[in-house]
Curated annotation (Swiss-Prot):
Residues 1244-1551 are annotated as: Glucosyltransferase. This is UDP-glucose:glycoprotein glucosyltransferase 1. It comes from the Eukaryota. It comes from Rattus norvegicus. The modification Phosphoserine is found at S1277. Pfam families: Glyco_transf_24, Thioredoxin_12, Thioredoxin_13, Thioredoxin_14, Thioredoxin_15, UDP-g_GGTase. Pathway: Protein modification; protein glycosylation. Recognizes glycoproteins with minor folding defects. Reglucosylates single N-glycans near the misfolded part of the protein, thus providing quality control for protein folding in the endoplasmic reticulum. Reglucosylated proteins are recognized by calreticulin for recycling to the endoplasmic reticulum and refolding or degradation. Belongs to the glycosyltransferase 8 family. PROSITE patterns: ER_TARGET. It is found in: Endoplasmic reticulum lumen; Endoplasmic reticulum-Golgi intermediate compartment.
Length: 1551
């Protein structure tokens, strides 16, 4: 017989990496197996984790349709047609055939890369939230009884098509429904017609019938057809989620915290653990390979593997010298593996590090590896700011933040990148050129454009360089470089800061603006101030009748007779006479003039024949020419301020800010020698690149729409039948194919070849050239093009009348000229054609030949002009309607694919606008793309086309962070490198990682999935740390993510992805944590085991932990627009139209942050009724889904990504001096908190009408079965000793399913109320990673937002405490104005002095004689706590201290003690908390509560201590156990009352 030692020896001898299997392999295995058969059989233990949604799963067909809709609505509708009847169950005998049918239908519209992304997306179930959102919106309608599908017409529902007509007749009387971004709108020919929303399930016959009838009604222009998914009878199974991590951390067993209660295991479906699990290498044996080679030895191989696993999983601690090089040794081990397995090895080592570490300590590290890593680290630090040990991931140069980015946002990045890369690929750009072009930064710069202020139209009030009042100021620009205190405004005799007020004198805001200008002047602010008065500019206007003209002439009179400064004083005097809110009148002007200049005839100044009329016409001309937008306008160095910045208080602040900001700009210019002393400063400012002749908001707006120009085909507009059959992208390609361009110098490849004539700017002018406005637009474009060699122009006709020969002469003449003439002749001829006199002559019957120009082939021109083919105009008109979505005759300018318009009928778009447009394109994208295209060496016309198409593609990308340029040094010895497949587009993926960090645990599995999904060039650089002094990873980890849906052997869908921890060591104590995306709130729902204390030696086979996604968070930031500060204590509610207040929250002062718990659907955000709604109103909102002017703020949650909104609020006019928190107690109106407090036995507290002062609120936290057992005993001790009614508040985040199920039953038996509260740790607050420290954080960091405002005071009682007195006494204890009271640590047990850390060092000096308090029991006055912003102060201090891992070792206790000077603590009398560790035995008899503190000297387990120290503890324990037995019996008999178990499925709880 072999001993276990022999077997180990055999295993060790076999432990060599087996890659090539040598001939005696069979012999080796036979020997090893022979030994192993005698070993005792022991079952392998495992832990599994799954996560599902609360809502039911929708058919995958619907999710696939949403994937396509994200690409385009056109693809969505095509897919809907292609997938008819897929949903009918009789079509498919298995899940796999159903899945394959979906893919087959979808693949028609997708490239190979997108096909993979679709499979991944279906595996992630990322669109299940979108379908559920539609489902919730449908339920809100609500659906008519017994209908599988239904229609909603302006709020009226029906499922009978017959009644549709009558509903349509009355529809205009009802308001149109609010449509959302995710709605599927069928292309409509008449946007004004009624909206019909069809709720149905695609893929079914019933859907198809109604759908086709609605399409024909839409095509006839009778309806606007909108489709929303709706499943009348969903399958009753949840969605299995992935994209999260599961951590199994090893717990310290210094203090035993395990419950000794026996747990019955549940039946677990063991098939969850597959035979061919990928973790397949044990001690060098590749078992997957061995099973393939020796199928007959399956059983023996299984035994052999198990033995090897058990021998490896011993976890003896390592010596400090063994730890030092673990990071480098792990890197060496990974890099030694064959390149295709390196990621597998990295995943295996990082995710199972505690059991792998010992073997790794034997790995040798080569000098080259070490040197290369250290060399690269200098570079990482210098260019991307990474320290040794840090991690980073870049995809095509985009930084993917592993801490904040979840898999769903990463998926979006992959998809966006695929669009661009495939677009470039379709345009024939490949390989390295593709990546170089992709990395061009062509995002529109955030430049503030400025207009030229060197205009005679401006009347300057002062001039800093000339006026005597500034004589004492220094005039040298070198003064700018002299150091001053921060924020000091330098007074220099130069016109560095110029402010121009463009005003209409009779506008009511003008008086305020004049007084601000006056304030700047009188305070000697270094500003040159000027005015432009925009008034009536008709020839003969009488200033005695027109107040605006009167102000202008009076100003000019004084300016001319005296000077600008006195003219301005006169202006202020005029406006001083005007009462607030009134307008200036002629008599105001007359009275000031008569008083100041009594000797002058006022009529001669103001009247029709006034000699003081300068600038009147120029002023309006300047205003219209610069296009600066509606009056009033204030320019700072030519840059217009935003409208909201013109508020008087705001304007003052923002101007000071601008002065300081531009000072920095000038300092730099002087320092670099760009601005010298003798230069004219204003000239210098006006020569900056951001100065343009005209500001056109249409051109400068951030919202931009682009054509997709990436398709290619061989169709043209002169074949209308073919053209009309193309899809949008195909039509655009045909339009581009058919274009002939006008260019300067008439150079095109037909005549002369010169590669410098790639023209980076292409304008397509869209309009009706047989109408004056269309001709004018084209004329201005041609005029501009004559001045620029960068531009080419072509036309698209959008006729406003029925198409016929007589209605289109100019359009046909332009087309014929472009088809038949040289570029130069065509240009000259077309310029003639768009003049008004030509159109008039043609209309009068003059022959078109009369207008021919020199060098023109007239007969060829006439032949084309007179042919009867109108295809090109028909195609153009169809294109305008279907793709550009224009009405007949509307004008648009398309510049490099960007659609500007439609322009209003009277809107000016002139030569200056074309100039501005060209400037912007050249600066942001045109030149950069042109220089890359030049390197491709394609001919000129093709090159200009390419610039246009590439620009449209790149510019259409959502604005994100700039791509990072990285040129890493060495990758010979320290990087994993995977090459992409040749000839296909590939992603450039770079990762930097230390293989023994938490980031590596997530990154390795992620990269493995990406490798199966996408073609990529991958480089993973090792970023190791040296000289480790601690074990770098103390946890096992699994990342749940699969590239495609998996199936069982019988072709059914597998039960969804799960995390599997197989072959785990049995001796350690584990705690299980989920690592989910930031906006998910998950809870443990089904497991009898204690997930906080998993001890595998006591488990039968499998610990199966089931979690549920309880809520998706809606997060936001809120500011008061008046103060710019967060409105602390403001409350929001979130609900639906049927149930307006489902949840409620409070705004924090930190960043104005708030969070609300929701689920997929459409939600309405409101201010909470009561003080919030009385004092404030919502002013504006951003990131929401309703139009800015809508009454309700609607927010749609329809995906798994974070949703963060911004809300600005404003105090109501009569509430300006009210304070939200001054009287928070009045919030007890029948608002939300009352509407669903779950009282005992699940009742709402309204029925238990209790005066709130007569209730004691007790808060506690617990995690793990032992502490929940203590918690129940603590509650019992409170109830036995307290006569006043009690309400318990528990932190829900970490409670076990067992506790949540039992608590309603206990509440009913002992007649108390309880509530579960929860809050998600905000993403911006420094995160803790250890579960115990997270729970400590919840004890102190969120007290102001965890409870409703109606709770004034609460007591915190630790779970392991026993109460021996009535807690009413503590509740009523006078805190002397402090926000909270804590008990100080006892000093009486002298033998513990060595452990009292607060008596020396940092704590002794910080406390300065004050006591150090224990956090096991405290009382909080929430009104005071909120009033002094204690929560915000505590979070602020925590944020600073927690960055240092060595501070706040007892977070919940150290933080309030550290803040004792800012947030005072009232010390409670010592008897309120007795604990044996610190207090002597004599004081025990006075104890009001006993706490089972840990004893650092004896390390006695909690349970033993409880029994020994507290005599009544065992009685309480027995009493609860009997109640639990009773509960179990009733549960098994099914006699539990419904409401007693309701908590488990409760729909909403408060924060």
């Amino acid at each position: 017989m072999c001993s276990r030692g022999d077997a180990n020896a055999a295993g060790a001898a076999a432990a060599r990496r087996v890659t090539g299997l040598c001939y005696n392999m069979g012999l080796l295995i036979a020997l090893a197996l022979l030994c192993l058969f005698s070993l005792a059989e022991a079952n392998s233990k495992a832990i599994t984790t799954s996560l599902t949604t609360k809502w039911f799963s929708a058919p995958l067909l619907l999710e696939a349709s949403e994937f396509l809709a994200e690409d385009s609505q056109e693809k969505f509708w095509s897919f809907v047609e292609a997938s008819q009847n897929i949903g009918s169950s009789d079509q498919h005998d298995t899940d796999r055939s159903y899945y394959d049918a979906i893919l087959e239908a979808a693949f028609r519209f997708l490239s190979p890369l997108q096909q993979n992304l679709l499979k991944f997306c279906l595996s992630l179930r990322s669109y299940s939230a979108s379908i559920q959102a539609f489902q919730q919106i449908a339920v809100d309608e609500p659906p008519p009884e017994g209908c599988k599908s239904f229609l909603s017409v302006h709020g009226k529902q029906t499922c009978d098509l017959g009644t549709l007509e009558s509903l349509l007749l009355t529809a205009p009387d009802r308001p149109k429904p609010l449509l959302f971004k995710g709605d599927h709108r069928y292309p409509s020919s008449n946007p004004e017609s009624p909206v019909v929303i069809f709720y149905s399930e695609i893929g079914h016959e019933e859907f198809s019938n109604i759908h086709h009838q609605l399409i024909s009604k839409s095509n006839e222009g009778k309806i606007n057809y909108v489709f929303r998914h709706y499943i009348s009878n969903p399958r009753k199974e949840p969605v299995h989620l992935s994209g999260y991590g599961v951590e199994l951390a090893i717990k310290s067993t210094e203090y035993k915290a395990k419950d000794d209660t026996q747990v019955k295991g549940t039946e677990v479906n063991t098939t969850v653990i597959g035979e061919n699990d990928p973790i397949d290498e044990v001690q060098g044996f590749l078992f997957g390979k061995l099973r393939e080679l020796y199928p007959s030895l399956e059983g023996q191989l299984k035994e052999f593997r198990k033995h090897l696993v058990e021998s490896t999983n011993e976890m003896a601690p390592l010596k400090v010298w063994q730890l030092q090089d673990l990071s480098f040794q792990t890197a060496a081990r990974i890099l030694a593996a064959p390149v295709e397995l390196a990621l597998v090895v990295m995943k295996d080592i990082s995710q199972n590090f505690p059991t792998k570490a010992r073997a790794i300590t034997k790995t040798a590290v080569s000098a080259q590896l070490r040197a290369e890593v250290e060399e690269n680290q200098k570079y990482f630090k210098g260019t991307i700011g990474l320290q040794p040990g840090d991690s980073a991931l870049f995809i095509n140069g985009l930084h993917i933040d592993l801490d904040t980015q979840d898999i769903f946002s990463l998926f979006d990045t992959l998809r966006n990148e695929a669009r661009v890369m495939e677009g470039l690929h379709r345009l024939g750009i490949e390989g390295l050129s593709l990546h170089n072009i992709l990395k061009l930064n062509i995002q529109p710069s955030e430049t503030d454009y400025a207009v030229d202020i060197r205009s005679p139209a401006i009347s300057w009030v002062n001039n800093l360089e000339v006026d005597s009042r500034y004589n004492s100021w220094p005039s040298s620009l070198q003064e700018l470089l002299r150091p001053t205190f921060p924020g000091v405004i330098r007074q220099i005799r130069k016109n560095l800061h110029n402010m121009v007020f463009i005003v209409d004198p009779v506008h009511e805001t003008t008086a305020e603006l004049v007084s601000i200008a006056e304030m700047f002047l009188s305070n000697h602010i270094p500003l040159r101030i000027g005015f432009i008065f925009v008034v009536n500019d008709s020839e003969d206007v009488d200033g005695m009748q027109d107040a605006g003209v009167a102000v202008l002439r009076a100003y000019n009179y004084v300016g001319q007779e005296v000077d600008g400064y006195h003219a301005f004083q006169t202006l202020t005097q005029i406006y001083n006479k005007v009462r607030t809110g009134e307008k200036v009148k002629v008599e105001h002007v007359v009275s000031v003039l008569e008083k100041k200049y009594p000797y002058v005839e006022v009529n001669s100044i103001l009247g029709i024949d006034s000699a003081y009329d300068q600038n009147r016409k120029e002023a309006r001309g300047y205003y219209e020419q610069t296009g600066v937008g509606p009056l009033p306008v204030v320019l700072f160095n030519g840059m217009p301020f935003e409208k909201e910045q013109l508020d008087p208080d705001e304007l003052e602040t923002i101007t000071m800010h601008k002065i300081l900001e531009t000072t920095t700009f000038f300092q730099r210019a002087v320092y670099l020698g760009e601005l010298s002393h003798d230069q004219d400063v204003v000239e210098y400012i006006m020569n900056q690149p951001n100065v343009v002749p005209r500001i056109n908001s249409r051109i400068l707006t951030a919202k931009r729409e682009y054509l997709d120009l990436t398709a290619s085909n061989n169709f043209y507009v002169d074949d209308f039948a073919r053209f009309s059959a193309l899809d949008s992208r195909g039509k655009t390609a045909a339009i581009a194919n058919s274009m002939n361009y006008l260019t300067k110098k008439g150079m095109s490849s037909k005549e002369i070849y010169d590669d410098s004539f790639i023209r980076p700017v292409t304008f397509w002018i869209v309009g009706d050239f047989d109408s004056p406005s269309g001709r004018q637009l084209l004329y201005d474009a041609i005029k501009h093009q004559k001045t620029s060699n960068n531009v080419r122009i072509s036309m698209i006709n959008n006729p406003s009348r029925e198409i016929s020969d007589s209605s289109t002469p100019v359009s046909r003449a332009i087309w014929a000229a472009l088809q038949t003439q040289t570029s130069n002749s065509a240009k000259n001829f077309i310029t003639k054609m768009v003049k008004e006199e030509t159109a008039e002559a043609l209309a009068a019957g003059v022959d078109i030949g009369e207008f021919s120009v020199g060098g023109m082939d007239v007969s060829l021109f006439k032949e084309v002009f007179e042919s009867s083919r109108m295809d090109f105009i028909l195609s153009h008109a169809l294109y305008c309607r279907d793709v550009l979505k224009l009405k007949k005759g509307q004008r648009v300018v398309i510049s490099n694919g960007r659609i500007i318009g439609p322009l209003e009928d009277s809107e000016l778009f002139n030569q200056d606008d074309f100039h501005l447009l060209e400037n912007i394109i050249l600066k942001t994208s045109g030149q950069k793309i042109k220089s890359h295209i030049q390197q491709l060496r394609v001919e000129e016309d093709v090159a200009s086309d390419l610039v246009m198409k590439v620009d449209a593609l790149l510019s259409a990308q959502p604005k994100g962070e700039a791509r990072i340029e990285y040129q890493f040094f060495e990758d010979k010895h320290s990087a994993i490198k995977l090459k992409p497949k040749e000839g296909e587009t590939y992603y450039d993926v770079v990762a930097v990682v230390d293989p023994v960090t938490r980031e590596a645990q997530r990154l390795a599995p992620l990269l493995l999935v990406l490798a199966q999904l996408i073609n990529m060039s991958l480089r993973v650089f090792m970023n190791c740390q040296s000289k480790l002094s601690d074990m770098p990873l103390k946890s096992f980890y699994r990342y749940v993510l699969e590239p495609e849906i998996s199936f069982t052997a019988d072709n059914s869908f597998a039960k969804g992805p799960i995390a599997k921890f197989l072959d785990m060591p049995q001796s350690p104590l584990f705690t299980l944590n989920l690592n989910t995306p930031e906006s998910w709130m998950v809870e443990s729902v089904r497991t009898p085991y204690d997930l906080d204390n998993i001890y595998l030696e006591e488990v039968d086979s499998i610990v199966a932990a089931e979690y549920e996604l309880e809520y998706l968070l809606l997060e936001g930031h809120c500011y008061d627009i008046t103060t710019g500060q967060p409105p602390r204590g403001l409350q929001f509610t979130l609900g639906t139209s049927a149930n307006p207040t489902t949840v409620d929250t409070i705004v924090m002062a930190n960043l104005g942050y708030f969070q609300l718990k929701a689920n997929p659907g459409a939600w309405i955000l409101r201010l909470r009724k009561g003080r919030s709604d009385d004092i404030y109103r919502i002013y504006s909102h951003d990131g929401t889904d309703s139009p800015p002017d809508a009454n309700d703020v609607v927010v749609i949650l329809n995906n798994f990504k974070s949703k963060i909104i911004k809300v600005k609020v404003q105090k109501k006019a009569d509430m300006a001096n009210e304070d939200l928190l001054s009287d928070g107690t009045n919030e007890n109106e029948s608002g939300f908190w009352d509407s669903f407090k779950w009282g005992f036995s699940g009742q709402k507290t309204e029925e238990v009408k209790q005066d709130k002062d007569d209730i004691i609120n007790i808060f506690s936290v617990a995690s793990g079965h032992l502490y929940e057992r203590f918690l129940r005993i603590m509650m019992l001790s409170v109830l036995k000793n307290t006569k006043t009614p009690v309400k318990f508040w528990f932190l829900k985040n970490y409670l076990s399913p067992t506790f949540k199920e039992f608590i309603p039953y206990m509440a009913k038996k002992y007649n108390f109320q309880y509530e579960l509260v929860q809050y998600k740790w905000p993403r911006w607050l420094h995160q803790q990673t250890e579960k115990q420290r997270i729970i400590w954080g919840y004890k102190i960091l969120f007290l102001d937002v965890l409870f409703p405002l109606v709770v004034d005071k609460f007591l915190f009682v630790d779970a392991d405490q026993i109460v021996r007195t009535d807690l009413k006494e503590l509740r009523d204890f006078n805190l002397d104005g402090a926000p909270y009271g804590y008990t100080p640590f006892c000093d009486s047990r002298r033998e513990m002095d060595g452990y009292r850390f607060w008596k020396s060092g940092y704590w002794a000096s910080h406390l300065a004689g004050r006591k150090y308090h224990i956090s096991a029991l405290y009382v909080v006055d929430l009104k005071k706590f909120r009033k002094i912003a204690a929560g915000d102060r505590l979070r602020g201090q925590y944020q600073g201290l927690s960055q240092d891992p060595n501070s706040l070792s007892n977070l919940d206790q150290d933080l309030p003690n550290n803040m004792i000077h800012q947030v005072p603590i009232k010390s409670l009398p010592q008897e309120w908390l007795w604990c044996e560790t610190w207090c002597d035995d004599a004081s025990k008899k006075r104890a009001k509560t006993i706490d089972l503190c840990n004893n650092p000297m004896t390390k006695e387990p909690k349970l033993e201590a409880a029994v020994r120290i507290v005599p009544e503890w065992q009685d309480y324990d027995q009493e609860i156990k009997q109640l639990q037995t009773l509960f179990q019996e009733e549960k098994e008999l099914g006699t539990l009352h419904e409401e007693e178990t309701q908590e488990g499925s409760q729909k909403h709880e408060e924060l």
